[in-house]
Amino acid sequence: MINGLIQPKGSVSKETNKNSIALSLGLKFSEVEYLSTEILIDTYIVVFDPISEMVFYVGNAKGNPQTWNLNSDGNLILTTDFSTYTLLKIGLSNPDTSLKIGYQRKKINDSLSSIESVAGYMNSNFVSIMEFQHLITSKPNLNDMETWDWSPALDAAISYVQSYIPQTAVNSQMYGVMPIVFPPGVFQYSTEMKFTKYLNSTGSLSTCYTLIGSGMTSTVLQPITQGQNAFTATQCKINLINIGFRSGASYQTGAVLGSSTAWLPVVHSNWRCVGFSGFARGVVANLLFDSTFEDIFIQNISNMQSTSDVSYGFTFEVYTGPANGGTTGDGSGDDSNQITFIRPTIETSNADNAILFNASSINSTYPHHAINVFGGHIETHNLKAKCYNLKNCFNVNFYGTIFSQNGSAVDTNYRLGYIEACYNINFKNCRQVTTNRLTAYSSTDVKSIKITGNSKNIIFDNNHFINPYYSLNTYNKGPSYNIDSDTATVLDDSYLVINCTFNTYTNRNITSKISISNKNICNKNHILTVNDNGELVVSYTTSTDYSVTPTDILSFTNTGQIKTNGSIQLGIYNGTAGSKSIDFYSNGDKTTSMARILVDSSGRLYIRSFNGSQEWVFGSNAITPTTTSVYSIGSPSLTVNNLYVQNPVTVVSDENYKSNIQKIPDELLDAWENVEFNMWKMKAAINVKGITDARWHVGYIAQKIKSVLENAGLNWQDYGLITYESWIESEETYDQNGNVLSPYKAEGEIYMLRMEECLAVEMAYQRRKLDRIEKQLQK
């Protein structure tokens, strides 16, 4: 319609307005007139109705106008004094009208001389698909364009716009492409649309197509042939805005971008508010670079013709062709990359064998990479369909995306996501959930997410997961019941969970591992993990590729124990002299140090026990107690096995430390005459060495000395020769970690001798006896 190009009613004179109409239609001023009862209509080519502000072609009408009104098509029913006629409204979509009024769209390169006219202005406007409707031959219902087959119009429009204006850029000959606009409606077509580089273009710059609709549910393009692609695009850019595609037959694919076998990529394309509904494969990207998809909507994914073939929502396929400029089909070309999705919606799979978001490359040498998804949701509405599948990909990132595997309950679990041979895959602030609920757990169950192959650096950061064990307390809290990495080359090292929650939001957030490296060549790595015993383990490795299992070097148990396979160096980073200590708070009051190991600045080692009341000092040449004549080494029931010394034992024998000093009385020596020397084997030695190999020992027997003294009427307890201890039965005791502090001890008693005192009595007895013999000899 051109009424928008004329002057607004009443704003200018009739002559000015008539002149505007004449210029826009390429007519003479005298061939245009205002419609009234005072004109002879057959003397003009077009008339302007000031009531409707529309222009009409006079055609074969004759006579003086009497009455007129618009019909439902917007044409004018005119009655003259001669007859009644239908005057067609002037519209560029009607080629017959355009021809009759002397105007038809011209490409800008053919009409530069008239660019200052209204016709030139119209030539620079977007191309409407309605301009090509006259090419349509299949019109089952003439009055319903939604029944027409628009294939001829679509093909003609694409062919027409691709060379709209010649341009020279970067020493290349290219052609500017005029956007094609679609009004609201459903446009059926039986053959796929094909977009590719205009043949007469040279250089690397691509032909850039743009299709604009009135909204993805208002403007709908519908392929109607079984197995048909809605469109294919190769070696070009294609922009889609506010337009929808709806499957009109079985086994169809929405969009195919790039070739899978030849270097014919789609590049720098931008889609905004674009929908695909009902296709077996929504969008297939064979070779795609540097493109953005904003608010795309892919839904109602249907079955492939063979249900063994996978249906897809959006899929990045394997490229098997050569690199740019190559000829060998070896898959050596760069794969799809630099792709951005903003708020995508991919949902509702009517096919069980379906993947909503797929990226699979030929191998890890040529991976799909640099794919970023911001927000959106990927929702199956079918518990058997996968939300995502990634294979041979690098640097694929999801930010705030919801992955929801929902639908009618099933009695087993199906994969929500699958990752194979991928590197640097990041899920940041995502939600990965299933609505399926199982009543029991089995180690053979399929877990929601599978990581396999040589996958590394799969990061789940601040995600929330819901698995089928939502109601099973034992199995609803950790990643091991949600993520299966048993067949990954580096097992659990293939992925990292950071600050994630599982099932209920009230469960504690979980971080599975922390790895810290030096900043140079990163070959010195400390890794923090928690093992199945609840120990915090610090391990170390010089490997940068997980080829060597890290060595555990330090651990902290869940009861506070510290374990290490190395040394502890206290104060090594302190340049100021001073004591360093380890304190033990063991009585439970959290304030009193019950024992301490301390080293002073001179190197003396202090061991304090019993709240500091007992202390031993390891000096430069002696081990000493801090209080004299108080502490013992061993006890009657817990003796020291052997004591190895170079010099004889020195004991205190200072007169100043003794009282009631006197000679050994004869009654003791008289009794000692009956003390025997004996030889024996130790029972403990027999238990270890056997009766034959156990050695003989000689000396005194405590009980025999006791009997000798008692038989002589002496109280053995008046003398320090014999010691006696007894004890009651005591059970084994343990610390809080289950370690034995003291073993079980049966009830018992023991007699012991102070051997040097016994020998002193023996020598006194022998001396007295010698003295008596000498005196006898002297007589």
Swiss-Prot record:
Q: Which GO terms describe its molecular function?
A: lyase activity; peptidase activity
GO cellular component terms attached to this protein's record: virus tail, fiber
Task: List residues of the Peptidase S74 domain.
Answer: 653-779
Q: Which UniProt keywords apply?
A: Degradation of host capsule during virus entry, Degradation of host cell envelope components during virus entry, Host-virus interaction, Hydrolase, Lyase, Protease, Viral attachment to host adhesion receptor, Viral attachment to host cell, Viral tail fiber protein, Viral tail protein, Virion, Virus entry into host cell
Enumerate the CDD domains for this protein: Peptidase_S74_CIMCD
* Cited PROSITE patterns: ICA
- Determine the domain of life of the protein's source: Viruses
Q: Where is this site: Cleavage?
A: 653-654
GO term, biological process aspect, one: proteolysis
Which InterPro entries does the protein's record reference? S74_ICA (IPR030392), WH-like_DNA-bd_sf (IPR036388)
Protein's UniProt name: Probable tail spike protein
Q: What is the lineage of its organism?
A: Viruses, Duplodnaviria, Heunggongvirae, Uroviricota, Caudoviricetes
